[in-house]
From Swiss-Prot:
Keywords: Amino-acid biosynthesis, Cytoplasm, Diaminopimelate biosynthesis, Lysine biosynthesis, NAD, NADP, Oxidoreductase. It comes from Trichormus variabilis (strain ATCC 29413 / PCC 7937) (Anabaena variabilis). This is 4-hydroxy-tetrahydrodipicolinate reductase. Pathway: Amino-acid biosynthesis; L-lysine biosynthesis via DAP pathway; (S)-tetrahydrodipicolinate from L-aspartate: step 4/4. Catalyzes the conversion of 4-hydroxy-tetrahydrodipicolinate (HTPA) to tetrahydrodipicolinate. It catalyses: (S)-2,3,4,5-tetrahydrodipicolinate + NAD(+) + H2O = (2S,4S)-4-hydroxy-2,3,4,5-tetrahydrodipicolinate + NADH + H(+); (S)-2,3,4,5-tetrahydrodipicolinate + NADP(+) + H2O = (2S,4S)-4-hydroxy-2,3,4,5-tetrahydrodipicolinate + NADPH + H(+). It comes from the Bacteria. Belongs to the DapB family. It is found in: Cytoplasm. (S)-2,3,4,5-tetrahydrodipicolinate binds at residues 168, 177-178. The gene is dapB.
Amino acid sequence: MTNQAPIPVIVNGAAGKMGREVVKAIAQAPDLNLLGAIDSSPEHQGKDAGELAGLSEPLEVPITNQLEPMLGYVAGERQGPPGVIVDFTHPDSVYDNVRSAIAYGIRPVVGTTGLSPAQIQNLADFAEKASTGCLIIPNFSIGMVLLQQAAVTASQYFDHVEIIELHHNQKADAPSGTAIQTAELLAELGKTFNSAIVEETEKIPGARGSLAGEGIRIHSVRLPGLIAHQEVIFGAPGQIYTLRHDTSDRACYMPGVLLAIRKVLQLKSLVYGLEKIL
């Protein structure tokens, strides 16, 4: 570890389940310094972010809902590396959050899913013009990246594939960003999957799931008791090949989050996907 000043970090969505894990991980990383904790929930205003995350000692960083003043404060810190904001908020607010951060020269690391392709392109253009690094990562789990790589390899040999993603019932968007990204990676091969051999009729609309690119179907499940799970199921005459990743604890995302915080400072534009920085 060098003697360089620690990276100043803001966590947006700090009172949420992922936000609390991020606060805890940052507090335990000697090269990172939590300067701000943002959350819109009224019941958490003024509470210490460390105590809320379950740390034994307070961090003396109070939860606030004032994003712009915090961005300005961190941007005004001229000593040490530029600031980073980690966003685990909501699909309705993440786009504006990221634009505001880039405008202040703060590097966004975005774990919130639900951004449309057009929004991602707009943010990419904005980051490019500002020469500011930005990372949008649908899934911070290294295990999920390995699953996606295995799926790309398998899709060269199988012509039929469907994706099932399962999440807790507080997740706001469907399908998950990870499932969409997985389908996009398979579609990049340029082949069409799941050529129909019969004319299908959905007796209930949506029964066959949502249709992604190149004929790939995604099925979404939302239930209490789940965290985050994904299956990629390949089929061929006489065989089924299933890839599955299960998240049992949100701590599995933290190595990817910390890596992204450190890597985003080296970027001058928007990068999409954890696999691009491994």
